[in-house]
Curated annotation (Swiss-Prot):
Biological classification of the source: Bacteria, Pseudomonadati, Pseudomonadota, Betaproteobacteria, Burkholderiales
Pfam families, per the entry: GIDA, GIDA_C_1st, SAM_GIDA_C
Record text on subunit structure and interactions: Homodimer. Heterotetramer of two MnmE and two MnmG subunits.
Name under which the protein is recorded: tRNA uridine 5-carboxymethylaminomethyl modification enzyme MnmG
Binding site for FAD: G13, G14, G15, H16, A17, G18
Length: 639
């Protein structure tokens, strides 16, 4: 049976990737259908009840800058907010929020149900409709066919998912949800290269059985209270609560070692590779054998539940071992587990076989986003989902894809890393992955991406108005700083001397003062109304802090940012220099066999991508350029 209506875009999956994909496509005016096996679980935080962190917070800000939902939903559901790396430079500062699971799901569902052009349907998708090498639609478990111009697949850990607790295992996409076995088999039939990965989650603990009096309290930031969205305000936050810190000990480690003979990871039952940067407690004990303690964060799961998430003891050990290891931790001696920890193994598909639009090369009109591409984390999934939704929508409208560059966004870094290098383990974003991170800060994601989002039809009138007011205010305040001069004989020179700790030797403007070490924008504005009489910083919109941060950072780091801009411009040539799709690299004279094999395997689309493949040297790129300029790189089809 075929559904009576055809769609522009169908999104399969209602997790963080799927919800952002569906919202993006619908905001662009595409008739969009989101199919999920459970409407109640739309936007569910399946593992850690938190959003953001180093690199991850940058992605959330970028999603928000383009009108996405994750940041705004977090502001409505966050029960603790912190700025990580607050004492370090602006490039690596990152927002993190502890979330209330119930409030977050409600915030996401509300946005989905009230988004024009977006329909929801509850069903499991078992099959894809493919004609030739183009996707036509999907088929649900009950045999109902939905037709669409484009399909975005965001299946998370559900593709042939298998849950492990000790040596027991069973099919499942996550605890309580079925695996997508038929859909995974169908994708394998289409000859899409795949592999297996693994992730895990810790046991959940009844907070009434935790002794917090012997733990270290970890409160959120209070002055100021952070927000995630550029349109967010602290007043939107629900009640704020602390997290708590404890540690494992030698007894804990002995218990874990004693259970390794029943660990699915250490007995070969699990074949999938787990995340390097979020290892299980078994992995920590094995890899860091010399350490006698590991930090554990007790994180509340919400305001209306007693459950706590013990961040740091993800495990797939048998339940009896989990019980013992939890009770060996200080403050958890009487703890009661309400949900056991487990590992989940699932299929992913090699992202090197995707285009930068996240469309599969093998099947036209089919887009992949999220853990299906080998990533880990809500934020990485949401960023890919938004990009896939954008490009599916653009393709449905007959328009060119939007391909974010590494130099303009962490989204661009994420996608380029996946497609150029592939994954051997679940991919997690860090600021260290971005070579231009000083230009890709949390504070300026809107300056980088909101205008692009507006052009794509993603940014509504209100967000655009707020952005324009902020942009104008930053420009106006920066100009004002340049226009105000202070000299050794100026009436407020003594105040400047006190501020600097030394006398002024020559006349300078306020931007020069602000560039001095230890001098802040706040200190400059406090010099006195006689030289500084700023207009309102749009505090009616809650923008004052954003504007002052932008002004201070852009002034203090101007020289570094300008040098980075020159470097970016220099790299643009390689980045956009196209490589013929059918180029046989074994015919390029002078390239080593290793480089030839890697280039033929990865099939980079541009010279810039080729240069980021491990083992491809600048000398190899020069040989490739010579080859192309001689015309030898043209394929039969392009001649």
């Amino acid at each position: 049976m075929r559904y009576s209506k055809n769609f522009d875009v169908i999104v399969v999956g209602g997790g963080h990737a799927g919800t952002e994909a569906a919202l993006a496509s619908a905001r662009m005016g595409c008739d969009t259908l989101l199919i999920t096996h459970s409407i109640e679980n739309l936007g569910a935080m399946s593992c850690n009840p938190s959003i953001g962190g180093i690199g991850k917070g940058h992605l959330v800000k970028e999603i928000d800058a383009m009108g996405g939902a994750m940041a705004a939903a977090t502001d409505e559901a966050g029960i603790q907010f912190r700025i990580l790396n607050s004492s370090k430079g602006p490039a690596v500062r990152a927002t993190r929020a502890q979330g209330d699971r119930v409030l977050y799901k409600a915030a996401i569902r509300r946005r989905l149900e009230n988004q024009p052009n977006l329909s929801l349907f509850q069903a499991a998708v078992d099959d894809l409709l493919v004609k030739g090498d183009e996707v036509q639609g999907v088929v649900t478990q009950m045999g109902l066919e939905f037709m669409a111009k484009k399909v975005v697949l965001t299946a998370g850990t559900f593709l042939d998912g298998k849950i492990h607790v000790g040596l027991n295992n069973y099919a499942g996409g996550r605890a309580g949800d079925p695996a997508a076995v038929s859909l995974s088999a169908r994708l394998k039939e289409l000859k899409l290269p795949q592999g297996r990965l693994k992730t895990g989650t810790p046991p959940r603990i009844d907070g009434r059985t935790i002794d917090f009096s012997v733990m270290l309290e970890q409160p959120g930031d209070l002055d100021p209270v952070p927000v995630f969205s550029y349109l967010g305000r602290p007043e939107q936050h629900p009640k704020q609560v602390p997290c708590w810190i404890s540690h494992t000990n030698e007894q804990t480690h002995d218990i874990i070692r004693g259970g390794l003979d029943r660990s699915p990871m250490y007995t070969g039952v699990i074949e999938g590779v787990g995340p390097r940067y979020c290892p299980s407690i078994e992995d920590k004990i094995h890899r860091f054998a010399s350490r006698n303690s590991h930090q554990i964060f007790l994180e509340p799961e919400g305001l209306t539940t007693n459950e706590f998430y013990p961040n740091g003891i993800s495990t797939s050990l048998p339940f009896d071992v989990q019980w013992e290891l939890v009770r060996s931790i200080r403050g958890l001696e009487s703890a009661v587990i309400v949900r056991p920890g487990y590992a989940i193994e699932y299929d992913f598909f090699d992202p090197r076989h995707l285009r930068h639009s996240l469309e599969t090369k093998a099947i036209g009109g089919l887009y992949f986003a999220g853990q299906i591409n080998g990533t880990t984390g809500y934020e990485e999934a949401a960023a890919q989902g938004m990009l896939a939704g954008i490009n599916a929508g653009l393709a449905a409208q007959g328009k060119e894809a939007w391909l974010p560059k590494r130099s303009e966004s962490y989204i661009g870094v994420l996608v380029d890393d996946l497609i150029t290098r592939g994954v051997q383990e679940p991919y997690r974003m860090f600021t260290s992955r971005a070579e231009y991170r000083l230009s890709l800060r949390e504070d300026n994601a809107d300056m980088r991406l909101t205008a692009i989002g507006r052009d794509l039809g993603l940014v509504d009138d209100y967000r655009w108005e707020v952005f324009c007011r902020k942009q104008e205010a930053v420009s106006r305040e920066t100009s004002r700083l340049k226009d105000i001069w202070v000299g050794p004989k100026h009436e407020i020179a003594p105040l400047v001397t006190q501020l600097l700790g030394q006398e002024l030797s020559h006349e300078c403007n306020l931007t020069e003062l602000l560039r001095r070490p230890g001098i802040t924008y706040e200190a400059i504005t406090a010099l006195g109304n006689r030289i500084w009489a700023p207009e309102s910083l749009d505090d009616d919109l809650g923008l004052a802090a954003q504007i002052s941060d932008q002004v201070e950072i852009s002034v203090k780091y101007q020289g570094y940012i300008e040098r980075q801009a020159v470097e970016i411009a220099r790299q643009e040539h390689n980045e956009t220099f196209p490589l013929p799709e059918g180029l046989d690299y074994s015919q390029v004279l002078g390239l080593s066999k290793e480089v030839q094999q890697k280039l033929n395997l990865h099939k980079p689309e541009t010279l810039g991508q080729a240069g980021r493949i491990s083992g491809v040297t600048p000398a190899a790129l020069s040989l490739l350029l010579v080859h192309l300029k001689k015309g030898l790189g043209r394929t039969q089809e392009t001649i």
